[in-house]
Amino acid sequence: MSTNLKVTLGVLAIALAVLAGVVLVNRGGDSTPAAVAEAVVRPDSHRLSTAVDSKTTVVEFLDFECESCLAAYPSVEKLRAEYGDRITYVVRYFPIASHPNSYNAAHAAEAAARQGKFEAMYKKLFDTATVWGHQQQSQAAVFEGYAQELGLDMTRFKADVASTQVADRVKADASDGEALGVQGTPTFFINGEKFAGRPDYAGLKAAVDASLNS
């Protein structure tokens, strides 16, 4: 084999390897807009309101034991009260492992959701967060008390809290969050785009207004 032929074949082999690498990179990981939108809001995601025109969707990844989420909570509630069904508001779980009762709280909320009481438990957990938050011991009994106050079937609630189905549901939200680049809470998405402003009433309102007026 001549030297020129060897060089030509070598160049061709390198080109083919590069092309194969590009194809593999493009195939690895589905980052199409449709896939991103699906990861932001799933069919079973918890909606606190649903817009009549589906124009504006706000998604919050939260941890019930997160102090920043608690600080944002009044702004979120004010925003929801102001816009009502003009926006779709979605809550997704993103419990932080360093918070001792974040998973317990998320499981309690999901167990309540299975009896149609997600929003009531969501509000209860934030309204009382200074009572149960950042306690080193389990607050499961406290959450059971909230479930009783909400009139839930306690046998079913306790079974759901301990179930793999509820644990998997919470983990699924967290996995979506990680795939979307969520690193802390609260993290908001507006129409699939990560919100980069201040997570207060003024910042969220400006982003929502921009979406509604677009």
Task: Please tell me what each predicted stretch does.
Residues 55, 105, 184-185:
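A structure-centric signal for secondary-structure junctions around beta-strands
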Residues 51-52, 81-82, 115, 180-183:
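Extracellular/periplasmic catalytic domains that process cell-envelope and extracellular macromolecules
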Residues 59-148, 214:
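Structural alpha/beta surface segment adjacent to cysteine/selenocysteine redox centers
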Residues 1-27, 78, 145-214:
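C-terminal cap of thioredoxin/glutaredoxin-like
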Residues 1-97, 171-174, 210-214:
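Extracytoplasmic thiol/disulfide redox context detector
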Residues 29-30, 117, 130, 166:
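Generic structural signal for secondary-structure transition and capping sites
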Residues 47-50, 132, 195:
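Short clusters of hydrophobic/aromatic residues that line enzyme substrate/ligand-binding pockets
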